Amino acid sequence: MQIFAARSSRSVSNNIAKNVFGLVGTELSLVEAEFERQASSNIQVIDYLGEYLRASGGKRVRPALLILANYSVGGTGKGDNVIRLATVMEMLHTATLVHDDIIDNADLRRSRASVNARFGNQTAVLMGDWLYMSAFETTVKERSLEIIDILTRLTRKMTEGELIQLTRIGRLDISESEYFDILRRKTAFLFSACCEVGAILAGADKAEQDALRDYGMDLGIAFQLSDDILDLTAETESLGKAAGSDLLEGKLTLPLIYLLEKEPALKPKLEKIMFDGEYSSLTRDDIKNMLNEHGILVSIKQRADDYAESARKSLDVLSESEYRSCLEEVLVFVTERNK
């Protein structure tokens, strides 16, 4: 029964992905071309690295959200400024991944060698910086102080989130509130900004803008909760990055926070895994089995579903359209995905 349910959820998620990305497929093709343009440089090494990152792909969820949000409140969707800002969001996201991989000493990203693994940390640091600079250079040309303010605050919050998380590395006394603070800063604010900027570019009124901003925030939280489940349950082949890496990198996610509340005697074993950088005292399957025994994975899936439902309710402000429906489908895609 569980296998059937997993396959059913996977099938639903895959079908929704086709619907969502199919609806804005033309626009996302324009984003790919714009990414290539923004990441190009007459400096050979930057040009090469920019193409390496672009070709690494990714789901392009964030630019898709900006475009869908723009359409949902009467925007043009394909307008040059929409495509440019959608690309900016993907570049900011890519920059954070490049820097995250350095910090985490990660070897794999999107099923390819990470930039730091392939080209070294020094090159990766500078390339991440360059991506941030390029993204803001494009944003400034839009001459929108409102959007510049949103992206400046976003970048500050993402950086703060990374710094806060660094101070918690290797610690098992992380509270649930601390976990959610990091989650919002590192993940959810970017989703929120994508939706809000899409609304602004469409000339949305305040109620629509606020609704899409709130939708993006709750969506981002649901996305990360699902990601934390996948880190402990999915395989490397489907994730495109090393499975089970959070604990090995010394990061305590919500499933393990809950598990320690149920099984405090596990603390020395989890500390050893963090210290060794490998599943030595416990296997990943051992942990997954305990999470299932205590109903923790089901509980966190329900939390993700609750945030998704809150996001859906935010959309009630918007007029009915295929784009609003697509934003609702994104919520199912995020909570039912297997990668």
Locations of regions flagged by a protein language model:
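All-alpha prenyltransferase/terpene-synthase fold signal
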Residues: 1-339
